[in-house]
């Protein structure tokens, strides 16, 4: 059979797209892109063009049908809308690990939960120990938060040498930490939850369960139920990105059942496709049916959770997370007067609680749980890894800034708290990277020394 030679331009295009695809799946690169976006936001927000930065993210964006219209700022749609997809991917990863990975054991799943509680309690107590004025004591929850996107991005800078279970442990801990932070916001910084929203969310969840029961595998069918879950959680007053976590945890971890094994179906449809392609009077329309069935069999070969993660990963890593960083990392430092005693202590307390309180709480509680025999360290995780996770958990960034906006009324204290969060996040990132590099080198040296020559 004569081999068809592809045009040179098409060869170059295919090679370029293949290289681009490999590039997009390198997590270290996604971490660099994320940090570049954060630095750009900080420079922009403190430059002569700062007004344009604020104006851009406050631009209203409206969705609606007929008289039913919902309008919010671009900043809202990024933080509460797009980031739901990030949390969806996080929920899927946690679901996989609970099913067959590092969190599949109850004793192992308990450890990140306990560590997260320690990582919330110790920073809060450390902040309060600075003896603030009563108004500034309201900021106790600012250092309890962990910015998942930034912490995972910094961890990605250490590359593939870091065991995957360390990333899973950080994700599990940060998710629990974030849920605690959202509950703190709901119960301490708002008028409480509106329970009518839970009814709306329940309708969406029942629709998802119904679609799964009848074997619907197309992701598009779950967009509307997912949107209803998101809307319901939004109506409760809780952070709507929790909808992503819930839906991610509900994603099936086993492939959809078929009448025949997917590999057998792929072999049969491939043979049928080749037979029709070699027909002397070939009609392109004759190839559509076997191609469609072949794509369906290929799709069903993988569990939905694996398939969805692979599809969404590049969009989250190189689209959603950098946009999120650009929209949230731009904190204006003008007007922060640190000569006043109150703001001084707020900044110091927030910074110390994040940089020291987070690792202290996470490591100490983890050690205590393991020491008492209530938990075990997950596979491939040692105490150096726990310290690394503790240091990276000190990156409070956007979530801490969000809580600060709710906690402080005085502009001076608010500005000082933001400065403390930014300083602590930078220090925690540098300490985490330094510790991670040292840990990797120590492990490599120990491995080399122990290997036979």
Curated annotation (Swiss-Prot):
The keyword Protein biosynthesis does not apply. GO terms for molecular function: sodium:proton antiporter activity. It comes from the Bacteria. Pfam families: Na_H_antiport_1. Its main location: membrane. It is found in: Cell inner membrane. The chain crosses the membrane at residues 23-43, 74-94, 111-131, 139-159, 168-188, 191-211, 214-234, 235-255, 316-336, 345-365, 386-406, 419-439. It catalyses: Na(+)(in) + 2 H(+)(out) = Na(+)(out) + 2 H(+)(in). The keyword Cell inner membrane applies. GO terms for cellular component: plasma membrane. InterPro entries: Na/H_antiporter_dom_sf, NhaA. It is a multi-pass membrane protein. Keywords: Antiport, Cell inner membrane, Cell membrane, Ion transport, Membrane, Sodium, Sodium transport, Transmembrane, Transmembrane helix, Transport. One of its GO terms (biological process) is regulation of pH. Signal peptide: none annotated. Belongs to the NhaA Na(+)/H(+) (TC 2.A.33) antiporter family. Na(+)/H(+) antiporter that extrudes sodium in exchange for external protons. This is Na(+)/H(+) antiporter NhaA 2. It comes from Pseudomonas putida (strain ATCC 700007 / DSM 6899 / JCM 31910 / BCRC 17059 / LMG 24140 / F1). The gene is nhaA2.
């Amino acid at each position: 059979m004569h081999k068809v030679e592809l045009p040179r331009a098409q060869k170059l295009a295919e090679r370029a797209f293949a290289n681009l695809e490999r590039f997009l799946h390198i997590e270290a690169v996604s971490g660099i892109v994320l940090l570049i976006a954060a630095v750009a936001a900080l420079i922009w927000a403190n430059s002569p063009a700062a007004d344009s930065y604020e104006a851009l993210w406050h631009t209203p964006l409206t969705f609606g049908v007929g008289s039913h219209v919902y309008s919010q700022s671009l900043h809202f749609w990024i933080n509460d809308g797009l980031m739901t997809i990030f949390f969806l991917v996080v929920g899927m990863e946690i679901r996989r690990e609970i099913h067959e990975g590092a969190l599949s054991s109850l004793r192992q799943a308990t450890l990140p939960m306990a560590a997260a509680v320690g990582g919330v309690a110790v920073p809060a107590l450390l902040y309060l120990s600075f003896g603030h004025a009563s108004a500034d004591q309201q900021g106790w929850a600012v250092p309890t938060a962990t910015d998942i996107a930034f912490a995972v991005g910094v961890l990605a800078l250490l590359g593939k040498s870091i065991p995957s279970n360390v990333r899973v442990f950080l994700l599990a801990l940060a998710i629990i930490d974030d849920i605690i932070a959202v509950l703190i916001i709901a119960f301490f910084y708002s008028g409480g939850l509106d329970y009518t929203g839970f009814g709306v969310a329940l309708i969406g969840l029942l629709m998802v369960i119904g679609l799964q029961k009848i074997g619907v595998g197309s992701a598009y069918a779950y967009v509307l139920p997912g949107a209803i879950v998101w809307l319901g959680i939004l109506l409760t007053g809780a952070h709507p990105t929790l909808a992503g976590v819930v839906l991610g945890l509900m994603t099936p971890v086993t492939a959809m059942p078929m009448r025949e094994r997917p590999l057998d179906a792929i072999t049969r449809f491939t043979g049928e496709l080749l037979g029709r392609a070699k027909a002397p009077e070939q009609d392109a329309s004759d190839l559509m049916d076997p191609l469609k069935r072949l794509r369906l069999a290929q799709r069903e070969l993988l569990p939905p959770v694996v398939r969805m993660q692979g599809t969404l990963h590049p969009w989250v890593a190189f689209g959603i997370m950098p946009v999120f960083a650009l929209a949230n990392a731009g904190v204006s430092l003008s007007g922060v007067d640190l000569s006043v005693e109150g703001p001084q202590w707020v900044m110091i307390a927030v910074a110390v609680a994040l940089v020291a309180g987070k690792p202290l709480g996470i490591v100490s509680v983890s050690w205590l749980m393991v020491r008492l025999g209530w938990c075990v360290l997950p596979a491939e995780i040692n105490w150096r890894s726990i310290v690394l996770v503790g240091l990276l958990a000190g990156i409070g960034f956007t979530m801490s800034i969000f809580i600060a906006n709710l906690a402080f009324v005085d502009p001076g204290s608010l500005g000082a708290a933001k400065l403390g969060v930014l300083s602590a996040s930078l220090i925690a990132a540098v300490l985490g990277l330094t510790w991670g590099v040292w840990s990797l080198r120590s492990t490599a040296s120990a491995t080399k020394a122990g290997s036979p020559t």
